[in-house]
């Protein structure tokens, strides 16, 4: 993997907002564009459908600590920050400083004061706290080179009952392998750090949406629930 691709590894995930993909050639062209160009693409109204439904399913509450890993232009960061206000903190994590600057500016314009930007590393989100309630990966994990290492690193920042939430796409018939990520593989990486599927949500036709947790408290194994589309 080239250094240029590694430098964009988290930010590119946002190009596939909510399962709306691009053709292979276009995707590779977009990867070469500066941050300013694909911010415009990510902020298009047709790319933010179902954000509210996702936020509702997450059942965030005021005071929660949330990490939006691969935050991109802040499509999820802003509404999640609002959901956990006034005393919750949203950490927008990216490895592209220009994207983080954009999120900070966007938050200021919208009067959102509880977002903190974090410049992550290739194998570690580098969060400044270890009491995170939710680490949220929207179309991000499949873009990370060392996935097991990254989820290992992420887990150390979570509370004992913290959640790792993954939205991604299973194998597709065409396209490069980096465009998808089998849920079974994610299950395996999570199990290696004692995280298991706690909830599955049917929000998207072409994406899986799974919340992972450790067995916690008196529970021998977290109950798996299938949440149907309203």
Segments (PLM) and residue ranges:
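Class I SAM-dependent transferase core
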Residues: 26-67, 73-75, 102-105
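Core SAM-dependent methyltransferase catalytic element
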Residues: 199-230
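Short glycine-centered segments of the SAM/dcSAM-binding site in methyltransferase folds
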Residues: 65, 89, 161-163
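Class I SAM-dependent methyltransferase SAM/SAH-binding core
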Residues: 67-125
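A short SAM/SAH-binding and catalytic strip from SAM-dependent methyltransferases
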Residues: 133-147
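Conserved class I S-adenosyl-L-methionine
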Residues: 163-188
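A short acidic, Gly/Pro-enriched loop at the edge of an enzyme's catalytic core
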Residues: 125-135
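A short glycine-rich, Lys/Arg-flanked "PGG" loop and its adjoining helix->strand segment in the class I
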Residues: 81, 148-163
């Amino acid at each position: 993997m080239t250094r240029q691709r590694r430098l964009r590894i988290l930010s590119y995930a946002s190009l596939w907002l909510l399962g709306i993909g691009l053709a292979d050639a276009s995707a590779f062209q977009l990867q070469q564009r500066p941050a300013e160009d694909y911010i415009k693409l990510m902020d298009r109204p047709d790319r933010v459908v179902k954000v509210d439904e996702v936020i509702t399913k997450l059942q965030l509450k005021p005071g929660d600590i949330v990490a939006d890993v691969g935050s991109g232009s802040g499509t999820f960061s802003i509404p999640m920050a609002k959901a956990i206000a006034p005393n919750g903190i949203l950490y927008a994590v990216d490895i592209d400083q220009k994207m983080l600057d954009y999120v900070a500016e966007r938050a200021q314009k919208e009067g959102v004061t509880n977002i903190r930007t974090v410049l992550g590393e290739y194998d570690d989100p580098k969060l400044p706290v270890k009491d995170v309630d939710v680490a949220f990966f929207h179309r991000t994990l499949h873009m990370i080179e060392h996935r097991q290492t990254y989820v290992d690193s992420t887990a150390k920042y979570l509370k004992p009952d913290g959640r790792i939430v993954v939205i991604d796409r299973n194998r597709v018939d065409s396209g490069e392998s980096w465009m998808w990520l089998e849920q079974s593989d994610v299950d395996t990486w999570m199990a290696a750090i004692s995280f298991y599927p706690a909830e599955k949500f049917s929000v998207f036709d072409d994406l899986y949406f799974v919340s992972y947790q450790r067995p916690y408290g008196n529970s021998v194994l977290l109950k798996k629930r299938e949440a149907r589309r309203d």
